[in-house]
Amino acid sequence: MTVTIVGSQLGDEGKGGIVDVYGDAVDVVVRYQGGDNAGHTVVHEGDEYKLSLVPSGAVRGKVGVLGNGCVVNPETLFEELDALRERGLTPDVRVAERAHAILPYHRVLDGIEEDVKSDDDLAAGTTGRGIGPTYEDKAGRRGVRIGDLLDAETLRARLEYVVPQKRALVEDVYNLEIGDDIDADAFDVEALFEQYREFGRRLDEEGMTVNCGEFLNEHLDNGDEIMFEGAQGTSIDIDHGIYPYVTSSNPTAGAAAVGTGVGPTVVGRGEVVGIVKAYLSRVGTGPLPTELGSVDGQTPNNGGRPDESDLATYIRDEGGEYGTVTGRPRRVGWLDMPMLRHAARANGFTGLAVNHLDVLAGLEEVKVGHAYTLDGEQLLTMPATTEQWADCEAEFRSFDGWPDVDWGAVADEGYEALPENARTYLDYIADELDAPIYAVGVGPGREETVVVESPL
């Protein structure tokens, strides 16, 4: 059986924590898209682990797989694995040979291109990790795959083909000089060959590379349980998100098949759990109809609600709303129900996990953007174009707040121990999305989760 964990909003919904909660029941945890731009925090036995590439389940002794839909920075991968080993863990991580490798020139170009876009207010809020340029090379059939690192002749041929193109892009299109502020080794075939050939040797020596689809299907044939772990969220999916303020891959559930080599009928027979943050947050630019306050350099000039900056700061501080990878403050807002309805439709949620419910505790009133108004019409889901979305006004519903309680005790006692007003809020979410509540996160630790039902 399979279960797919999907972010229903703009990323950072707490997917890693839910993977951790249900992880004991699975044998393999697979990431099917994204790269080391996807920061996630896992708390295990009181220790906190901040990861950006290694699948969350690897912290709990499960087999972790980076699928062919991922883009992999080998340097980050080995840094994270070494750090986990230094803390006494023995992570078992495999990498799809069809996954594409992030190279230094991808990261350089990511920064250059984001600077150019920022002049036109088109910046996507990239982490600068080279994710977008790597996916561009994948689509342009000029990428370097993990399997290429295992063969010296193939690796050299790939680099000799693509590196001159990257040099020309920097020098002739962006009119920049390689050297000084731009690392010359990032555009040097020999330097790249030596560095990435060494990565290939280590991958080979540690037996880390796999034919992903074959590897996973063998596990399924043996009766193993597999969890697909999505990164980011539905509303920054390159097809279903708020384009162009999106990531470069598909965090939605359909990509679990494409990004791993497991058939869509297999994924479809399993569960799809939508992870919902009890309010809204994001890093990056673009519209956000339910935004509270504003963040310099991210909130559009005509967006946000500056008169509610104190409330925004309270939620941001209580929720620790700062990027795991970048440390940037996240924009925050009330829950956006049209966004969630869109996510439920695009992913086919069979259940929901609502996180950070405790962050809103103590507020007298909690609001939800129930619908939008656009040109005098009510919309219950997101419009298809970002330009229309920017013109949407949120229609709010108000809920009575709930007190701050001993959330650890609530998690021990179960769903009925949640404050009544909090349950009313959760029931509203479940009813609107036509999916039951499987879990409620009321704190950062695994033990601070109210587990209602298991998808496995």
Swiss-Prot record:
GTP binds at residues 11-17, 39-41, 330, 356-358, 441-443. One of its GO terms (cellular component) is cytoplasm. This is Adenylosuccinate synthetase. The keyword Zinc does not apply. GO terms for biological process: 'de novo' AMP biosynthetic process; IMP metabolic process. It comes from Natronomonas pharaonis (strain ATCC 35678 / DSM 2160 / CIP 103997 / JCM 8858 / NBRC 14720 / NCIMB 2260 / Gabara). SUPFAM superfamilies: P-loop containing nucleoside triphosphate hydrolases. The active site is at D12 (proton acceptor), H40 (proton donor). InterPro entries: Adenylosuccin_syn_GTP-bd, Adenylosuccin_syn_Lys_AS, Adenylosuccinate_synth_dom1, Adenylosuccinate_synth_dom2, Adenylosuccinate_synth_dom3, Adenylosuccinate_synthetase, P-loop_NTPase. Its EC number is 6.3.4.4. Transmembrane segments: none annotated. Binds 1 Mg(2+) ion per subunit. NCBIfam families: PRK01117.1, PRK13785.1, purA. The gene is purA. Keywords: Cytoplasm, GTP-binding, Ligase, Magnesium, Metal-binding, Nucleotide-binding, Purine biosynthesis. It catalyses: IMP + L-aspartate + GTP = N(6)-(1,2-dicarboxyethyl)-AMP + GDP + phosphate + 2 H(+). SMART domains: Adenylsucc_synt. Its cofactor is Mg(2+). It is an enzyme of class 6 (ligase). PROSITE patterns: ADENYLOSUCCIN_SYN_1, ADENYLOSUCCIN_SYN_2. Homodimer.
